[in-house]
Amino acid sequence: MWQETKRELKEQKIEAAVRIFAPLGVPAELMQVRVTNKSDMDMCVRVTSAIPIYGRSADNLRDHRHVTSLLHRIRTTGRGVICKPVLSFDERGHQKNHMIYFEMGSQGDGTKPESFFPTVESFIGETGTFLAPDALKNKGKGCPAGCTVDGKEAMGAMAFPEITLAAGAHVDYILLGGMTEDPKLAEQAAEMFCTTKQADAAFEQAKNYWNGLVNISFETGNPKEDSYLKWICFQPVLRRIYGCSFLPYHDYGRGGRGWRDLWQDCLSLLILDPKEVRSMILNSFAGVRFDGTNATIIGDKPGEFVADRNNITRVWMDHAYWPFVTTKLYLNQTGDLDILDQKVAYFKAVSYTHLRAHE
């Protein structure tokens, strides 16, 4: 999966095109940036990239944010910024942290950044913002490779050498951000994707992989609807990998799939890969209680369910609808009536004390 966007500043006559994707086999996201001179004369360009490095649990976005930033240990390398907090913050018992967060960069020909702004403070300054940082307004030079900073909010900002861009010419930049427990991987990955040629090859590999996961196309006469239907078929793949609410500022859940998602994934797979759907339907029915309610936390294994969030049993008006409509479509598509004779145990992890209290 990938996305591309372009932005042109007509008054300045410069265009930036950005392509973002995840290279296969590397726990990172790669961003290719192409800056094009749209004018009819030479232009001096000095590019500074800036991506914040949050570097800890989503829980700390609002809770103990400052305290957890004090745990950051930040250093700059030849190609980027690396942050490894000393502890994983947990009031029940703090643990030694092994996760490393990084942001690396290079020019399309492999040229390394000239200097770095490894902390939010050094980049935005006292009066600036992320959109108007003091480091750019004041033409700050940053720090070189090999510097270290402790106890600050980390920032993957790096300044590249100033270049003269001829009329109509372009220059490429490659940015790589990720996380790993391997202390060598960040710098190794930076060398793997430090040129446009390497990044383009990784993109083609990733594109072929994702295109192969959706093995169906639509021709309704409406190209927009065709693309939308293909996107719908692709969503269950993303949900299996990332969950539903995987962003730290999302306000619902912790990223796992929910009851509706199980059945909606089955509906999609009826089109993409029908042979898997029978077992998925049977496994999903294992989350139904004998009173018609259902478990609300989905386990890691097929057919595994956990009792309700916060130990509160709830009833949603549409939850019973999804097993019905999914099974009905499966029967109509396959004619597999034998599935109705299969035995599946009810979900039992519940206390009915609250029900007896009203008797």
Where are these regions (language model features)?
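Aromatic/His-enriched, Gly/Pro-containing loop or helix-boundary segments
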Residues: I20, D291-A320, T326
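Alpha-helical support elements that line or immediately flank enzyme active sites
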Residues: D261-G287, Y330
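Hydrophobic or amphipathic alpha-helical targeting/insertion segments
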Residues: R34-V35, R46, Y54, A320-W322, ...
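Conserved small/polar residues in nucleotide/adenosyl-binding loops
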Residues: T353-E359
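Extended, loop-rich substrate-binding clefts of extracytoplasmic carbohydrate-active enzymes
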Residues: M1-A28, A132-M158, K230
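Short Pro-Gly-centered flexible turn/kink motifs
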Residues: M43, I163-E181
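Low-complexity, Ser/Thr/Pro/Gly-enriched N-terminal "stalk/linker" regions
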Residues: F203-G253, S279, N283
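Polysaccharide-binding surfaces and accessory modules of carbohydrate-active proteins
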Residues: A22-G25, E29-K139, A189-N215
